[in-house]
Curated annotation (Swiss-Prot):
GO terms for molecular function: ATP binding; metal ion binding; protein folding chaperone; protein-folding chaperone binding; unfolded protein binding. The gene is groES. Coiled coil: none annotated. PROSITE patterns: CHAPERONINS_CPN10. It comes from Aggregatibacter actinomycetemcomitans. This is Co-chaperonin GroES. CDD domains: cpn10. HAMAP family: CH10 (MF_00580). InterPro entries: Chaperonin_GroES (IPR020818), Chaperonin_GroES_sf (IPR037124), Chaprnonin_Cpn10_CS (IPR018369), GroES-like_sf (IPR011032).
């Protein structure tokens, strides 16, 4: 994938979500929620501060993160693959 995000933007690939409940029931429709875990594919250089310096990013390519899936999350198709473009501030945690 040939994409380079700007500023504090992060490109994510959403992880697949489990489609069966713990009891073995297949979940469909609204019961099968989207995962809020994703793999980081690309990271911008950081947020530009008022004094002209750049605040470095905390996430790096390859990290698995948990993110806030709501306003500000942009979905795009790049090279036939659906990716998410978000600000680093919408990332809630890095999974270790």
């Amino acid at each position: 994938m040939n994409i380079r995000p700007l500023h504090d933007k992060v490109i994510l690939k959403r992880e697949d979500v489990e489609t069966k409940s713990a009891g073995g029931i297949v979940l469909t429709g609204s019961a099968a929620t989207k995962s809020t875990r994703a793999k980081v594919l690309a990271v911008g250089p950081g947020r530009l501060l008022e004094n002209g310096s750049v605040h470095p990013m905390h996430v790096k390519v390859g990290d698995t993160v948990i993110f806030s899936d709501g306003y500000g999350v942009k979905t795009e198709k790049i090279d036939g693959e659906e990716v998410l473009i978000i600000s680093e501030s919408d990332i809630l945690a890095i999974v270790e």
